[in-house]
Every structure is written in structure tokens, then in C-alpha cells.
Amino acid sequence: MDEKTIKKSILSSSNDEKIIYKSRIKKFQKNHKFYIILLVFIAILQFISIAFFTRGFLLSRHVLDNISSQNETSKLPPRFNKAVILVIDALRFDFAIPVNESHSNYNLNYHNNILSLYDSFASDKDASSLLLKFIADPPTTTLQRLKGLTTGSLPTFIDAGSNFDGTVIEEDNFLKQLHLANKTVKFAGDDTWMALFHPFLSNDSFPLESLNVWDLDTVDNGVMDYFHDHLQQDKEWDVMIGHMLGIDHVGHKYGPDHFTMREKQIQVDQFIDWILKSIDDDTLLVILGDHGMDHTGNHGGDSIDELESTLFLYSKKPDMWRLKETSNYNIDNLGHDYRSVRQIDLVSSLALLMGQPIPFNNLGWPIDEIARNDREWSQFVNSAISQLQLYKDTMQIHHGNDEILEPLAKNISNTPPTSDPEKFVKLGHKYQKVFLQTCEELWAKFDYYSIATGITLLATSLVLLISITKLIPSIVVNQMVPEFVPGIIIMVLVTNLCFHGIFYVYQQPSFVDQFWGTLLATAIGIIIGCYITIFDRYNFIWIAMRLGETLADYWSRIAVMFMIIHALLFTSNSFTIWEDRIVAFLLSTFGMLTLYEFVFLPKRQSTTALLTATISEKEGTTSGVNPSTANSNYLPLTRFARLLGGYHSAVLIIFTRLASMITICREEQGEYCIPTFNNQNNSSWWVLGLCFLMIFILPACITGYYNLTSSYQAAAPIWINVFLKGILGLNFVYWSLTSLENNSAVIAIPFLRDVTIFKFTLARIIAGFSLIASNVGWLMGPLCIKLNIHNTDVKSHEATILGYTNIYGSEFFLLVINVLISILLFNKPLAQLSYFLMCNQLLSILEIIDLLKLKENIIGPIALGLLSYQHFFTTGHQATIPSVQWDIGFMLSEKVTFPFTQIAIILNTFGPHILVSLSVALLTLWSQPPDVLKPQTLLGRIVSNCGILLTYNTILCLSSFIWVTHFRRHLMVWKIFCPRFIFASLSLIVTQLVVTFGTIAFASGRLIKHINDIFWK
């Protein structure tokens, strides 16, 4: 008898056992499919609730398609027949004025490099130049700024989400007016203009890819070449527009404090100087920034640095502007007291200067300095007031401010512009300010029906999740799953039939159309279908008593306390902005409590797992636990187990603290937060050195955890010591090349000047292997076990299966490694160090949960949930728009390419949530041999732990819904509470998708069946 025969005989079973197994596995496969369908229905219910709430809360203003005409606004002769408009993206105001080198905030890289504008203004003796501070209205994303600059209207928060999906602006705007007047508008630069205005632009325009922030020169060089070719030689244009992106892209890629910013600003300054000399006397030159940038180079929020940009008007004709007193243009202290105008004021100003009607939806006010005398100024004001009053009358706007507006309008009509121009101007400006405030308040109206529907549906889904995944025993849910699915399908059909029948017979409610009615009917059908099945077996009293029993033990109460504390953070803006610190504190608290448990309370016997085991032994196998293992759960921890548990607790505490040192700060945190996650540190050699060490340390750490259960066998060495180490090495090469690009000392080396092609190739190789090849290998690869024959006599059957006690967990974690290496590619070096710490924290939590017999306790999923939120913050993110790392989207392609750009940004932003959503199954599978739990019981417990993680994220999402609604009139609602609710919604969606389709549908079902096929258990 050879060794192969011995192995086969050890794993063989009788025919009766095989028949029983086949019946069991067939039932398992059937229930597995039903579980997936049930979770999909619950996910649909939650997605519908999020959709309703988002519809009701995220505002969108009503836009009229009216177009202004010269008959509606007073006809004024044009002062200029041609205009050159140059938009310099992210031209912060202090970039364009002289800054004293002794100033505390002076920086060589971004100050005193663009002096053409101020020099022209300061040396101007004949009033041909005008330089102003230009204040943007948040959000400061480029698309929203272009809308404001061309229509004169205010953006809403929901517009920020369309920055990458611009569609043609149908409302009246400055470019449409030029088009209607048969003016030729030529354009070069940011292709966002083509997305928004292509019907109004010349076919000779030259749009360029705008979203690739890694490319600093292509757009700028294209604009400069286009202007050199067309500005003087080509006479067939009336307005020429250029939009340069280099300064903005340098900010996104490196931050403002980088030598490349100085180079780019000098290039822009030279180009401006050339334009000043090249335009003719009849051309108006407008140079402006659409927004600024913060200290990290980002924008999108409403900090001062993000809102303050630059506006420069110039003509070679003298006496074009009527300047105010010199004190209004004080550049001291970075221009803190310098005169400013709002961006919405530009539209009416340009329209009046070019002799065009003011766009219909404009809410701005002409810039004071554009009028050369009082008479002309009163004419401008008269045109502006006529347009505003026409807009108000057409919109039929009524508000509490009418008692102010109506007397003002009457006084204006009774005050002829020619007789008392000063009074007329004052009345007109006051009218505009009050009307603008009125529109801002009116556009802040919420759809309370949709908000209430969203909150109600999400709260109901929370109750369903808790009932199905925790209150009802998993072994009973196994029996009920085949009843849930048909019940839900039938009720969804019935409710849709009823809803649409009612809508057909009776008038449809005003707050819900046919599409939203279908969604609501579907949600109600899912709820009714679930509750019919539940209450067919149980009642409210039993469920309430079961809830009390579940929360009776120590660790469950700790878990609930953590959830409540986290959910209550959203009750205050002060708590919300410090969420990163609070989450780290809660995770450290869990580590301290487990350390106390191992050191001082080794004989604790009151965990839910022990009680379940006891019940299983006394009452049979109701919970699915093998009775032979029940007594082992009663045994106190051995000395070695206590030492091991103490070690893992210490690792969790220390690594949580180390991870919290990687910070990206919110503006509201002020001086109390020192950012460490920045471009300088991510490109530093010490961080790259740590990443190099991680190539060897991370595989060694994972190997150590595997050796605890003798699981470092077969597939494990290949995955951990070859694949993981190899990908980490390639990853290190990629980010080292990126660091070289940031280093002025080495960038001059010829062969290092352009490594873009090599980086793209390397990134695609890593992504292809980690996203596709490694997962195919996992599906087809061997288990992490080895048959060890003790006796040299091959006729002896004495053998040990190494890795048997952790056969599920060791194999499943290889899939986690696949996902980890996928995520690491799309994260910057400091974030990769955070993931190294996270991996060790994750494995320590799994060991702690196993040692304390807490596999069925809710503390496990909650601890993993806290881990995901901590590392969301430590990988360079906050719940704000500016913290989204858009530049990562261009690691695989030079332009926005579906789906590669989206995959990169999702893996970068939600990597920790994806890892935890996949790893939550390990709470059940880690150190779980095949002979303890039946396949169905094992799957039921995995679903239970996944359900608790979903419950945690649902509670956070529900809390954010409630409190963002409560604070809807709060000063910080759009800056703090609204972004947090969006992040909570997206986190829940990502968790639902990964848990349902990744953890349950793909990984767990396949692994359980595969292992049971081998061992016939």
C-alpha cells in the first residue's frame, strides 16, 4: 500500500455516509441560493430608502428655460466687440499679488511667481486695468463654478456630484446669448466646456482631457499653442476662451508647496504677459480663477483658501474703469482686506460690457468699477434691476421678504435713474441683496414626504436585519429561508398591482410619480413578505424577550454601547468632525477590555457562545453545535491561551495607536490636528523605506498567524511568500517611481523624465493579477492543509492533517489577501502602511474572538466595523468632498475610462470597508474545523455575523439621516452633516454589495461546499 492509497483511505467514507452527505449538501446549496436572494431583497429595500431620502434632502433648484432679450432689458451699446477670456484653474488670490518675503505664510513655490496681473494694475495710470478678489460660491468643483460664471445663478449641493458627468446647460447663459447674437466663440482647454456649452462653441474649438490630474502640461500647452495660432492671425472670432489646468493639477498631485508649482506659475505668467501685448484696442481681456485651493491642493469645500480666486479686467483703451479709493486695494496680509466681488457678478458685468442681454436666471450685480461715470452706472443698474424683476415675476416667487421687496420695487419705480442716480443705485443694490437672500432660502426647501419615507423604510430594514440575523436562531432561519423568498416575491407583485391600480383609478399623490411609486410598492412588498413569514412562527412578545436575552451578556452590552456612541456622534458638528479620533478610541477601548479579560478574568463564563453551547448539550443540537464540543467551551483558558490573548490585545492596542498617527485634517479641526498624510510625506524616503520593509514584514506576520494553527501548508506559502511578497515589491517600485517624479534633484536625469508609460504598464500588470488572476487561482488552488504520516511504515494508518483545525479560515484569508493586494495598488504609501497595521489588527481580533469563544457574539462584527472606519480615516480620507483622492482614478489610464477609473476610486475610498465586509465571515470560519458544524449551520452563522455588520452600518446611516434632517437649517449642514450622510449611505451600499455578492454568494458558499466535498462532513 503506497502513501497515496493511505491518504485516500483516511478521507474515505461509507456509501451510507455519502448518501447522507449528498442529501445534506443538496439542501445546503438550495438554502445558499435562498440566502442570497433574501439578502438581495433586503439590500434593495435599503437602496430604495436611501434613494427616497436623497431625493428629499439633496436640493435641486427649479430652472426656467426662458431666454432674455434686448426688449426685456434695456438696450445698451457695447463697449467692446471682442473679448479674450482666460480661465486659470485654481488661481488663488494670493498667487496673483506680491507677498512680502518676511510674511509668516510666504512660500517661494507659490508666491511672487505671477506678477503680470498686479504689475499691470499697480502701474496703470490711465485706468485700463482692474484686479479684484473673486469669491466663489461653494461647492468649488469646476463644473459648478463654470455654471455660476456663465449663468449668474447659485449651485446646489447635489450639483457637485455631477462634476464628472456634465450635460449641456439648457438655461440661459452668457455663451448662449453670444450664440444667439451670431457671435463666434472659439475655445481651447478643459473639455468640461464642451460638455456644457458645445452647441454654442465653434467647430474649430480644441477641447482637452481635463480630469487626469497627473498630467500637468498637455492642457496648458494646448491652450498656449491654440492662442498663438488664432489670437492674432485668425480674425474669425468674437470671443476666445481658454481654460488652463496646470496650477490646479499641480495642487492635486503634489500640493501647492512643490517646486513644480513655481515652474507652472512662471509659465502662466509669461503667457499672460504675451496676451497683454497681443490683444488689440477693441478687445476686452478677462483673466480669472474659478476657485482657489487649500494647503493640500484640493478644493470642493468652502474654506477661505478654496473660495478666494482672482479676477482681472484689461483693455488697451484708457479710462475703461472707475477705480475706488486706493485703500480698497490693499495687498497687505495676503490681501485680506482687498476689495472682493462674487463670481455671480461677472455674468451681468460681461453682458453689459459686450452689449448682450443679461442671462435670464442671473442673480448677480454688476461690478461697480465697470461703469465710467454715474450716468453709465445708473444705466447698468437699471438693466440689472429689470432683469431681476422679470425673473422674480416669471418665477412667481413669494416669500416673507416680499414685505421688503415690494416697497423697494415701488421706490425704485418712483425714482428715475437720471434725476437721483445715487439713490436709485442704493435702492437697486438693496433689492438685489434681499432678492438673492430670498432665492437662497427658497431653494433650501426639502421634500419632507420623501425624507420621512426614506427614514421609515431604513428603520424598518434595520428591524428586519436584527430579527432575521440575530434574534431568530440561525438554525431556525435555515428552515425559514425557503419561505421568505416566495413570500417576498408574491407580496412585491401584489403591492405593485395595488399601488398602480389605485393610481389609475384615483389621482396620483403629488409627492410620488409612477417610478417612485413602483419603488415604494416594492419596498412595502419586501417588508410585508418578510414579516408574514416571521410572524407565522413568532410574535412581538417573543421577539422582545429574545432581544433581552441577546443583550444579557457582558460583551453584547459593550457592543451596543459602541454602536450607540458612534451613532450619537452625528448629534453635534463638534463630535462629527472628530469622528476619526473617537473611532480610534473605541477600538482601543475594545483592546483594553479584552486585555483585562485575559489578564484578570480568565474564568469568565457568561458569554453568549458558552450559553449556546450549554443549551446545545442539554437540548440536542438546536444551535448546530456538536455536543461533544460543548463541554470544552466551559473550560477556563489555559495559561498559554491567556498569554496569547494578552499578546493579541496588546498588538491591537499598539497598532490602533500607530494607525491613528496617520492623519488628514479637516479645516474645522484647526490647530488641534497636525496632518501627516500629505504629498510630502507620501513621497518621502522614510515612508518608502517602511513600505520596502513591509514587503518582508507583512508576509512574515501573516505566516506567524498561520503557524498558530499549523496552516502554513500547500497554498499558503505560494500566496503569502510568493504572490503577496511579489506584488508588494512591484507596488514599491511603482510608488518609488512616483516619488522620483516629485523630486527636483533627480527629475532632470534624462531617462527618469518620463516614466509614465512604464508606470501604466506596471499598474496594469498588478491590477490584472490581483483583480483577476489571483481570484481564479483561489478558485482552483489547493487548501492550506498537509497530510503528515508519523510512522515510516507506510502500512500504518497513523497520520495527522496539518492545518485541519483552521482549514476554513486559512483558505478564506487567502481571498482576503487577493483583495488586499488589489486595494494596496490604489493607495498612496502612507495608506499602505495603514493597511499593514489593519491586516495585523484584523488577525488579532479574529484570534481574540476565537480565544474568548465569542464567535456568535455581536462584539466581533462591531469590532471589525470600528476597524473599517478607523482605517477609512487613516488612509487619507475624511467625510468631505475635497478628501476624495481623484488623482488615483488615473493610475490605469490617462483619461476617464470606464470602469477602470471608477474601480480605482472605489477601492481607494472604500478599501477598508471592502476588506472588513469580506473578512467578517472569518469570525465564524477562523479556527473552525469541518467536523464541528454542519454546512447549513456554518452558513447560517456567517450570515448572522454579516447581518450584524450590516446592522451596524445601517444604524450609522439611519442616525445620519435623522440628524442631518434635524440640522437642515444649521450653518454647517452642507459642510459637515450632509457629506457625512452621503458617506454613510455609500458605506452601507458598498458593505451590502460586498457582503451579499462577495462574502455570501461567492466565497462562503464555494468554500464550504469544496471542503465538505473533500471530507464528506
UniProtKB/Swiss-Prot annotation:
Other facts noted in the record for this chain: Present with 300 molecules/cell in log phase SD medium.
Coiled coil (residue ranges): none
Domain of life according to the entry: Eukaryota
Predominant localisation class: endoplasmic reticulum
Leading EC class: transferase
Gene transcribed to yield this protein: GPI13
GO CC terms in record: endoplasmic reticulum; endoplasmic reticulum membrane
Membrane topology, as annotated: Multi-pass membrane protein
Protein family (similarity comment): Belongs to the PIGG/PIGN/PIGO family. PIGO subfamily.
Involved pathway(s): Glycolipid biosynthesis; glycosylphosphatidylinositol-anchor biosynthesis
GO MF entries: mannose-ethanolamine phosphotransferase activity; transferase activity, transferring phosphorus-containing groups
Annotated PANTHER family: GPI ETHANOLAMINE PHOSPHATE TRANSFERASE 3, PHOSPHATIDYLINOSITOL GLYCAN
Provenance organism: Saccharomyces cerevisiae (strain ATCC 204508 / S288c)
Effect of T901A: In MCP1-4; impairs growth at 36 degrees Celsius
Enzyme Commission number: 2.-.-.-
An example Gene Ontology biological process: GPI anchor biosynthetic process
Annotated keywords: Cell wall biogenesis/degradation, Endoplasmic reticulum, Glycoprotein, GPI-anchor biosynthesis, Membrane, Transferase, Transmembrane, Transmembrane helix
Protein name, entry field: GPI ethanolamine phosphate transferase 3
Chain positions carrying an annotated carbohydrate: N66, N71, N100, N182, N203, N411, N681, N682, N707, N742
SUPFAM superfamilies to which the protein is assigned, alphabetical: Alkaline phosphatase-like
Family annotation (Gene3D superfamilies): Alkaline Phosphatase, subunit A
Bilayer-spanning residue ranges: 34-54, 347-367, 457-477, 484-504, 515-535, 558-578, 582-602, 644-664, 685-705, 715-735, 765-785, 806-826, 829-849, 903-923, 947-967, 981-1001
Location within or outside the cell: Endoplasmic reticulum membrane
Function, as annotated: Involved in glycosylphosphatidylinositol-anchor biosynthesis. Transfers ethanolamine phosphate to the GPI third mannose which links the GPI-anchor to the C-terminus of the proteins by an amide bond. Involved in cell wall biosynthesis.
Post-translational modification: Glycosylated.
